[in-house]
Curated annotation (Swiss-Prot):
Gene: boka
Tissue: Strongest expression in ovary and eye, weaker expression in gut, kidney and brain. Little expression in liver or heart.
Entries under InterPro entries matching the protein: Bcl-2-like_sf, Bcl-2_BH1-3, Bcl-2_fam, Bcl2-like
Highest taxon in the source lineage: Eukaryota
Entries under Pfam families matching the protein: Bcl-2
Name the UniProt record assigns to this protein: Bcl-2-related ovarian killer protein homolog A
Motif BH4, residue range(s) on this chain: 32-44
Main localization, broad class: membrane
Annotated source species: Danio rerio
Task of the protein: May play a role in apoptosis. Does not appear to show pro-apoptotic activity when expressed ectopically in early embryos.
Membrane topology: Single-pass membrane protein
Amino acid sequence: MEMLRRSSVFAAEVMEVFDRSPTDKELVSQSKVLCRDYIHSRLHRAGIGWSKPEHGSGGTLAEVSSVLLWLGDELEYLRPNVYRNVARQLNITIASENIVSDAFLAVAAEIFSTEYSRKGLEKHKGVTWGKIVSLYAVAGALAVDCVRNGHPAMVHTIVDCMGEFVRKSLASWLKKRGGWADITKCVVSTDPSFHSHWLVTAACACGHYLKAVVFYLLREK
């Protein structure tokens, strides 16, 4: 009986972990792991040798990482030239950590600046999964630029910036959706309208990114 009681207690504790909402700290930490995975994938695709992250994603987060990469591929396929040569588009010197972080955070803020509303959902400050994938695509492309030009240390700067932006601007939105695992609905849903909505938000994300680049360049003049 004692063993059964302990098993029940353990099972309850495990279920509590899965049922509870993720904390801001957990969401930020997971966002950085996902960013490392995304950057590693893009560096590998570009033919740049790069060691796999020591603390890579596992379990549910590994599935999220796979979906994020798949959606990133789809987004980049829609607009193949948008997420390349990001440093050149922004006209920044990637040798400076401050410039790289400032540019990334400025573009991120502009991507998510547009108000967004959809029937049945609350109005939120421009957050969609399409825009989040767009931000990761920017991070991956910028990291490739940095490493290619001899500044691999900037990868850590970009990852830290991603975590900072998630903490300040995306954590509450993610928490309302139960965490990062919600992104898997973009590919597992059998509702054609859901996938159609994803393609629309992804296409819009490209537009918001291009607008962000223009605003950043105008700000620098």
